[in-house]
Amino acid sequence: NFVGLNEGDGFASVKMEGESWALSGDLDIIGSGDSLLIETGALTLSGAVSNTGNTRVAKDASLQLGDGEKTATLSGGLTNNGTVIFNQGSDFTFATDMTGSGNVEKVDSNTLTLTGKNSYTGDTVLHGGTTLVSTGATLGVKGSNATVTVENGATFATAGEVNNNIAILSGGTLAAWNAVQGNSTLSASGVDTINGNVTNGGTLLLSAADNSVGNNFTINGDYTGSDGSQIVMNSTLGEDNSPTDHLTITGSSFGQSGVSITNIGGAGAQTINGMEIVSIGGSSEAQLTLAKPVVAGAWEYNLYQHSDGNWYLESKATPSD
């Protein structure tokens, strides 16, 4: 059933119960409280919904924004105890604050930028496209065990506060902000930081799209790599203190990952202790290996784990012909 209470220039409240609803036009809701209530079934929006109150999605219901061709907008608050699905027809910025215990899915291939406070406690699955948590935005609740799953063909990056575990599947990418946003360099505290565990079955991309060097990606949790996973970095190959991208893991590391190094303008030099590229605060059990030879000038660099548990690029002179 569709129940709407009309009040002057718009609806005071809208309640939907049924199996499937599609709203392709614009809707003004001028009520308060849970003025848009999706009790059961699935509601797909492909127009502009202006809600002065709150939208609530019940446990067994779903709300889809966009129909794959058209883009939907939703203002007001959003309590998600069911499932919210993004299937927008174009790149989209979502500024609505989302709470609740429900799950979120992104199924389109466009870019979704989150700018609000997303404190829902359910899981998030990114099936495709790019998802960005912008500066000042949040995703997840501190101490939560919820997971963001980055599937094949999907990319996730943050300049805000992410309090979820991250599972990168084969073909998925967890990226540094400027690996996705070009030469956009930010210094906010949440940039390139995950407050949770990261399992990597795909790619952890630290290298900037503009070939700059010096990204520091931080995992405030454990890191687990699986066979075939990659960590991709830029370095200016030289002596110990030469610029390089860096991965900081405050917890422990497990499993295995390949490390791919792109030399950006380095001529090579003799290292003494080596260029630190990965630091680990807890138990350092992961096995990291170079994905391909790393050579600069007359110097070949190899990857070694030191007694501190951290990983370093160390150089040696290549044999002359």
Where are these regions (language model features)?
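Extracellular beta-solenoid/beta-roll
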Residues: 1-15, 23-25, 33-34, 40-47, ...
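Outer membrane beta-barrel translocator domains of Type V secretion systems
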Residues: 320-321
